[in-house]
């Protein structure tokens, strides 16, 4: 029902300072971001390492839904986003188990979501969403469209890079012996 933790969302007052901290100091790579004028905030996804992601959010003016959260702090973890392959199946499960949810939204194939309030989730705001993870990542953090793997010469062997089902890509350096063994095992599967 839940595929994985997709990202941790951090709300901040000082976006430029947070951007410098996460991208310049910790190496987070910017991905997709957007401003929501109705809710008066901006969000942006960042990739850390090979599969970890975080989201930075900040208000764009007074009346933002983040005002209450940021009224007593400079920033902090706002919510955790979990990925599901089927939001309707999850919704039905929550109703069956009498777990309240709110904020259900359906943006078509791009994004479907609902939230579980912290009072019903042990103090944590949980966003559950159905989406295509690669849609939210920067190009350098994912395989090109239609490509699921690549192999490149490196040192005395090669580096195999594969698309990850949770979005992004993972690279595995292999020495010459490991590369030959992998090629032999793949070949034997095809015989």
Regions found by a protein language model. Give the residues of each.
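Conserved active-site tyrosine of GNAT-family acetyltransferases
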Residues: 18-23, 94
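Short, structured motif recognition centered on aromatic/hydrophobic residues
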Residues: 5, 22, 51-57, 77-84, ...
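Ordered, amphipathic secondary-structure segments that act as subunit-interaction surfaces
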Residues: 75-98
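Short, extreme N-terminal leader segments that mark the start of a protein/domain
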Residues: 1-13, 21
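Vicinal oxygen chelate
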Residues: 1, 30-78, 91-191, ...
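Short, solvent-exposed beta-strand edge segments and adjacent coil->beta transition regions
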Residues: 5-7, 75-77, 167-169
């Amino acid at each position: 029902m839940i595929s994985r933790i997709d990202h941790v969302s951090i709300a901040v007052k000082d976006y430029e300072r947070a951007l410098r901290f996460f991208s310049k100091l910790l190496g987070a790579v910017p991905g997709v971001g957007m401003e929501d004028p109705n809710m008066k905030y901006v969000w942006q996804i960042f990739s850390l390492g090979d599969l970890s992601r975080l989201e930075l959010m900040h208000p764009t003016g007074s009346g933002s839904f983040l005002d209450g959260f940021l009224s007593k702090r400079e920033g902090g973890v706002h919510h955790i986003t979990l990925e599901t392959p089927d939001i309707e199946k999850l919704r039905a499960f929550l109703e069956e188990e009498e777990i309240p949810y709110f904020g259900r939204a359906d943006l078509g194939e791009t994004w479907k979501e609902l939230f579980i309030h912290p009072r019903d989730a042990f103090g944590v705001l949980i966003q559950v969403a159905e989406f295509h993870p690669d849609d939210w990542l920067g190009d350098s953090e994912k395989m090109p469209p239609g490509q699921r793997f690549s192999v490149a010469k490196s040192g005395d062997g090669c580096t195999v890079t594969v698309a990850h089902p949770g979005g992004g890509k993972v690279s595995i350096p292999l020495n010459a012996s490991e590369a030959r063994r992998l090629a032999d095992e793949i070949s034997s599967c095809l015989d």
